[in-house]
């Protein structure tokens, strides 16, 4: 009897652990959404002041440049990640946000001169209340690869 009760106890413990592990892996659904907008072409007005890029006097995008636009919506306390990719034949130059954005990001790798970058996003807790979502538009300036 001792062996069977031990065996039953071990099997039931393993089953409970498996169920709890599956529930932990499932987690809650992410509230983060990312929506890619159309790529801005030459002649379009440059929407933000990109760091390290001298905008022309007329504030229009020059030839051989494109701007990738991504709309992000992130819940406070979340740390989602996304990959931004330049159009084929283009390489990333710099990234930008509008002044006063509710969502910020950090690049997980060195992206200058590469076609894509993985970004980890976070919400500014001073601008977004607990339980709310923050909104931002992320801009990626890309230049034609030579």
Model-predicted regions and their roles:
Residues 1-32:
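Secretory targeting and sorting signals
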Residues 32-146:
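Extracellular attachment/recognition segments
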């Amino acid at each position: 009897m001792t062996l069977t009760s031990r065996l039953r106890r071990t099997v039931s413990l393993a089953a409970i652990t498996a169920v709890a592990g599956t529930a932990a892996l499932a987690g809650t659904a992410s509230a983060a959404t990312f929506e890619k907008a159309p790529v801005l072409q030459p002649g379009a007005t440059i929407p933000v002041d990109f760091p390290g890029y001298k905008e022309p006097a007329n504030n229009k995008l020059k030839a051989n440049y494109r701007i990738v636009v991504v709309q992000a919506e992130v819940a406070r306390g979340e740390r989602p990640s996304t990959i931004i990719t330049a159009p084929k034949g283009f390489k990333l130059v710099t990234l930008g946000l509008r002044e006063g954005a509710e969502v910020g990001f950090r690049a997980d790798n060195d992206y200058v001169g590469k076609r894509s970058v993985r970004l980890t996003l976070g919400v500014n807790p001073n601008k977004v209340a607990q339980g709310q979502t923050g909104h931002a538009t992320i801009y990626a300036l890309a230049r034609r690869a030579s």
